[in-house]
From Swiss-Prot:
GO terms, molecular function: RNA binding
Gene name tied to this protein: 1
Outcome when changing L61I: Assembles as small oligomeric structures which cannot assemble further into larger arrays
Subcellular location: Host membrane
Function: Protein that assembles into highly ordered structures and provides a specific site for viral DNA replication. Probably anchors the viral DNA replisome to the host membrane.
Domain comment quoted from the record: The hydrophobic C-terminus is involved in the association with the host membrane. The coiled coil region is involved assembly into protofilament sheet structures.
Keywords: Coiled coil, DNA replication, Early protein, Host membrane, Membrane, RNA-binding, Viral DNA replication
GO cellular component, one term: host cell membrane
Record text on subunit structure and interactions: Homomultimer. Self-associates into large complexes forming long filamentous structures. Interacts (via N-terminus) with the primer terminal protein. Interacts with host FtsZ protein.
Phenotype upon changing K3E: No effect on self-assembly
Recorded family membership: Belongs to the phi29likevirus DNA replication protein 1 family.
This protein's name: DNA replication protein 1
InterPro entries xref list: Phage_phi-29_Gp1 (IPR016408)
Length: 86
């Protein structure tokens, strides 16, 4: 008899498929099974982290130097003026 997939647990890691290469994991999402591409998830996490670092650096530059360009970039990219900026 085959294994019963427990939808409450996530499968950790990837498996190697001779035809398609590394495969993602299957994880339950709102009761449905969904393939998760681990490499894509890692890239998205890295981009989100870099975005947060850039945003914090611009806020700090705008605050410390009262830099109008940094304030403008923050307004264009993030939709608002930093705290304490004009």
């Amino acid at each position: 008899m085959g294994k019963i997939f427990d939808q409450e647990k996530r499968l950790e890691g990837t498996w190697k498929n001779s035809k398609w290469g590394n495969q993602g994991i299957i994880a339950p999402v709102d009761g449905d099974l969904k393939m998760i591409d681990l490499e894509l998830e890692k890239k998205m996490t890295k981009l989100e982290h870099e975005n947060k670092l850039m945003k914090n650096a611009l806020y700090e530059l705008s605050r410390m130097e009262n830099n109008d360009y940094a304030t403008w970039v923050i307004k264009v990219l993030f939709g608002g003026a930093p705290h304490g900026a004009k």
